[in-house]
Amino acid sequence: MKAIIVLLMVVTSNADRICTGITSSNSPHVVKTATQGEVNVTGVIPLTTTPTKSHFANLKGTKTRGKLCPNCLNCTDLDVALGRPKCMGTIPSAKASILHEVKPVTSGCFPIMHDRTKIRQLPNLLRGYENIRLSTRNVINAERAPGGPYIIGTSGSCPNVTNGNGFFATMAWAVPKDNKTATNPLTVEVPYICTKGEDQITVWGFHSDNEAQMVKLYGDSKPQKFTSSANGVTTHYVSQIGGFPNQTEDGGLPQSGRIVVDYMVQKPGKTGTIVYQRGVLLPQKVWCASGRSKVIKGSLPLIGEADCLHEKYGGLNKSKPYYTGEHAKAIGNCPIWVKTPLKLANGTKYRPPAKLLKERGFFGAIAGFLEGGWEGMIAGWHGYTSHGAHGVAVAADLKSTQEAINKITKNLNSLSELEVKNLQRLSGAMDELHNEILELDEKVDDLRADTISSQIELAVLLSNEGIINSEDEHLLALERKLKKMLGPSAVDIGNGCFETKHKCNQTCLDRIAAGTFNAGEFSLPTFDSLNITAASLNDDGLDNHTILLYYSTAASSLAVTLMIAIFIVYMVSRDNVSCSICL
């Protein structure tokens, strides 16, 4: 007799598990963030460099001016600016200029009292212009000026090109011809004779000597008064009578007298005035200047080319957007000074390699995966891991990694824009002073640099914060992508992991990473948790009563087990029984 029995049995599977993952690294780097402090990451982009001192150089992409007149031999820049005989030449145009003379003086000619006026600033003023030329005609007729007629004085200390007595081309030494008597203050107007909207730099001054020489030359031994006025700027002087040492500061021939030299800047169309008494040095040829040339303290000669000229380090080639070290003024394509080294995160948070599944069990491996990373994600930061009989397979998701890199690139570009804006602010502050000595007060400059440094550091901290925090965003996107690809062939078990109803080796994982995965290709079996199997029994001596006895015994045992389980759950819910499960 044959009997048919329906048996209930549970079928288990050898499913694989697939998780989203992050690469591991054996060489952690540290970056600073706004809220998390220092964080170890898998890679960094250094943003700062510490330069070393080098020669000053020509600025790349622009003309750089060293000496005002390169072809004027044995002449200082002040000689050129005053028009000293034998120092007359063309000043080349330039977008950048080197302030190379620490204490500008003339190399000879008539001795000047440098410390009484701002005459030492005259070469610096001229350097601040891109185009500079000396007028071909005199601005006034000195011989017929008020208080004349005058004889134009010369000096043996100031030889001309024929080695005869001479004087500066920018001034006429007005010595009374016949009327050597004291005079009340006289006024002469200085017209604007430049063209093309140029600034006119007019040089003038006065001569003073001991009492005997003053009477001999001018008929008056008393101190003389002088005033200049242009563009609302008025300057007053009173001459000194006698008391000058024979040795001159300029190293020229001994002289009993001295001259005081000053200048005034006349804007287009504006007239200047000079009020004077005896001993005046009336203006003659004037400087016509236009455009702007950035000026920096440095030294000559200029060797080679550089991206940036820095007062302390010389010529620099820009390799990083920022630099640490000694702060000073700089011109050109320069890095910005910051107080501390800066690094931008170029990867993910540092994670040591996660432990394998077989070492910790499945749930232990999940914990290890979340704490650590996976080696083998070549050229990728985010990807997938598969755990199963084949071991551990790892594949990088290059699209997700590229998105992360694009975000870092965007942060770099934002920092670059911030750098440009700050450079423009610094450059603007310098340009505003182009008519002066072009030196900012050190304390104000340092305060500005310190403020900009703090802004940049904060921007880098916030960028690092955003890059690191975006890991969650990338992993969540990967998890959604993985879930969509796996579809009904896997069960979401949390923590970015899925239990598959099929095997998933390296080939399977590579397909997932490439976005070409198809579950049908990996022999998906029927996976019902309960299977009903029909079993046929031959008549081997078991009667129906025996079979029913076995069945009732099994059913009763199952019922008792269910009742016990329900009772335990009830007691636990009432807090009468505690239950601890250790993994």
UniProtKB/Swiss-Prot annotation:
Record GO terms (molecular function): host cell surface receptor binding
Marked site (Cleavage) residue numbers: R360, G361
Glycosylation site positions: N40, N74, N160, N179, N246, N317, N346, N505, N531, N544
InterPro entries noted in UniProt: Capsid_hemagglutn, Hemagglutn_HA1_a/b_dom_sf, Hemagglutn_influenz_A/B, Hemagglutn_influenz_B
Pfam families linked: Hemagglutinin
Residue positions bearing lipid (S-palmitoyl cysteine): C579, C582
Subcellular location: Virion membrane; Host apical cell membrane
This protein's UniProt keywords: Disulfide bond, Fusion of virus membrane with host endosomal membrane, Fusion of virus membrane with host membrane, Glycoprotein, Hemagglutinin, Host cell membrane, Host membrane, Host-virus interaction, Lipoprotein, Membrane, Palmitate, Signal, Transmembrane, Transmembrane helix, Viral attachment to host cell, Viral envelope protein, Viral penetration into host cytoplasm, Virion, Virus endocytosis by host, Virus entry into host cell
GO biological process, one term: virion attachment to host cell
Membrane topology: Single-pass type I membrane protein
Signal peptide: 1-15
Subunit-level organization: Homotrimer of disulfide-linked HA1-HA2.
Protein name, UniProt field: Hemagglutinin
Taxonomic source organism: Influenza B virus (strain B/Oregon/5/1980)
Gene transcribed to yield this protein: HA
